[in-house]
Amino acid sequence: KAQQQETSLLSKSALIGKLLNKAQMLSQIIASQSGLSRDSQGDLRQLSELITSVTPQVTQTLGEGRAMGAYSLGQGFLNSSSSTRFDELLQQLEKLQAEYGLKLQDALGASKAAHAALDSLASTSNASLKQGSELFEEQVVMAETLDAPWQDFYDGVSRLMAQTYQLD
């Protein structure tokens, strides 16, 4: 309700970020209480960790870029603080892509069944980080003008995030 009452886009973004963190904590509690995080099978523990801790980092980072990019496109310019934050976000995406690839290999490599069922979705999810980085650079950071429709940008990043949600 607080998010709906807030009028500032940046304040809404911060509130949504807090809500996402609480949702991630809830999923970790559920996994812990159900015993998934302590299961005797290592592959189940790794998949549980992937879903509750790793993939939320992917969607959260893409979501931050989505919010900042849509905001900047809506304003028609990229202010200095947003430019700095985008530079940090692009570095974070690059680092996350390497870490995420390794964690996907670990989680799917532990089980032939998991690998067979999830390999394609995992590859698509991993690729979404590079695609997101390219999208942020092309349409916001390096764009000559910020006159592209913010809704198209927002929807494009949402589709990238959906690739990780499908893996979950």
Residue ranges and their predicted role:
Residues K1-D168:
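Hydrophobic alpha-helical segments
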